């Protein structure tokens, strides 16, 4: 079989590339889902955002909380505040009256304290990029109002999964922009009033039902945005859809080429091995044994190609999905685990079965007739 080594190697390479890209791309989008979903849930990512420039009072919040179907709600504000003594640096200064809604995940330092008068919980990525640590002083300025505080903790937040200044900034730049949470007490003391332009809500209700009930509760028609209209969630979902598309198109081309190459190669192999097959039959070898012998080549090509492809797929997924990889510059999340969709294993098994079947059918065709027929 040394005569066919080049063809076998080429088939193994094509199968490995096809399965590698297939597994890698599907692992990428599946891992995004697997890591962002619990992160969003743990930090209370808001399903709905009720917005009004006039702001919402504690009574308004109570009306929303009393709606049947609302799991949690909190008043919320997020504004771009400058970091004093740092040129061009700013953070998304964020306040939530309910840490279970649009909250944070503590990576280092103290737990979030809603009554703190000087505590600042700062993005850990921004802190790393700018040499801030727990216990350091920091001053945030917004429209002439300064808030002097002490960094109590380093955090991540689902609301800031993709931390950019605005829609004009495509990629996060933690050297100049991050986010920070302060307590409602510190915020209200600094601005001198109780002003929250948003009520963020966690609820599994449909938008239509929630909008109707929220409008009835507040007594007016409010601007309500879903999580699909928020940057972090929609962009993460977009990456998932892109990965699904890429994982369906490119690998298919490689796998089709590999299968066609297998059909051609096995046909040529059995044609050239016609005399040897006839000799084996003349020596008393049964058809089943000859079938097993030649079919095993196709089977081993499928096994080796798929195994190499699986390893390649993990490498592709890891290269994209790790804190220092492509997605690491885009997403800010605590977990970077790799997940394999279960259907990948079934498809790999199906590929091996198809390749083995091709080998089996090619050889069986040559076994028809007597040994004398094969030796002619």
Outline where the language-model segments fall.
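Membrane-interface segments at the starts/ends of alpha-helical transmembrane spans
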Residues: 240, 244, 331-343
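Small-residue-rich transmembrane alpha-helices
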Residues: 263-268, 275, 299-331, 341-368
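Short amphipathic alpha-helical coupling elements at transmembrane boundaries
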Residues: 2-3, 37-41, 275-282, 372-373
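Residue-level signature of the transmembrane alpha-helical core
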Residues: 12-16, 252-255, 295, 299, ...
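Transmembrane helix boundary and interhelical loop/hinge segments in multi-pass membrane proteins
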Residues: 32, 43, 265-278
């Amino acid at each position: 079989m040394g005569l066919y080594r080049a063809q076998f190697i080429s088939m193994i390479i094509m199968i490995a590339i096809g399965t590698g890209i297939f597994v890698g791309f599907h692992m990428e989008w599946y891992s995004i889902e697997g890591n962002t979903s619990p992160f969003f849930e743990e930090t209370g990512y808001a399903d709905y955002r009720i917005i009004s420039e006039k702001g919402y009072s504690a009574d308004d919040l109570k009306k929303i909380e009393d709606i049947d179907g609302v799991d949690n709600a909190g008043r919320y504000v997020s504004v771009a505040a400058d970091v004093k003594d740092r040129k061009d640096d700013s953070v998304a200064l964020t306040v939530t009256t309910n840490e279970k809604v649009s909250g944070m995940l503590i990576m280092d330092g103290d737990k979030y304290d809603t009554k703190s008068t000087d505590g600042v919980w700062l993005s850990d990525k921004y802190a790393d990029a700018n040499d801030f640590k727990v216990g350091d002083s920091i001053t945030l300025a917004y429209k002439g109002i300064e808030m002097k505080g002490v960094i109590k903790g380093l955090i991540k937040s689902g609301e800031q999964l993709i931390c950019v200044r605005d829609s004009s900034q495509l990629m996060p730049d933690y050297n100049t922009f991050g986010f920070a949470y302060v307590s409602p007490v510190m915020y209200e003391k600094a601005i001198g009033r109780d002003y929250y332009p948003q009520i963020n809500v966690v609820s599994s209700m449909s938008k239509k039902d929630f909008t109707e009930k929220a409008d009835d509760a507040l007594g007016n028609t409010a601007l309500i945005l879903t999580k699909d209209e928020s940057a972090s969630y929609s962009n993460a979902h977009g990456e998932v859809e892109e990965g699904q598309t890429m994982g369906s198109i490119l690998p298919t081309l490689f796998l089709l080429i590999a299968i066609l190459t297998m059909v051609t190669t096995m046909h040529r192999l059995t044609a050239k091995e016609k005399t040897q097959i006839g000799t084996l039959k003349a020596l008393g070898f049964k058809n089943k044994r000859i079938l097993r012998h030649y079919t095993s080549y196709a089977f081993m090509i499928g096994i080796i190609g798929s195994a190499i492809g699986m390893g390649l797929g993990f490498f592709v997924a890891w290269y994209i999905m790790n804190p220092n990889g492509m997605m690491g510059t885009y997403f800010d999340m605590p977990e970077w685990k790799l997940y394999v969709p279960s259907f990948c294993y079934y498809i790999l098994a199906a590929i091996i079965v198809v390749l083995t079947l091709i080998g089996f059918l090619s050889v069986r065709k040559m076994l028809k007739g007597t040994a004398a027929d094969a030796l002619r």
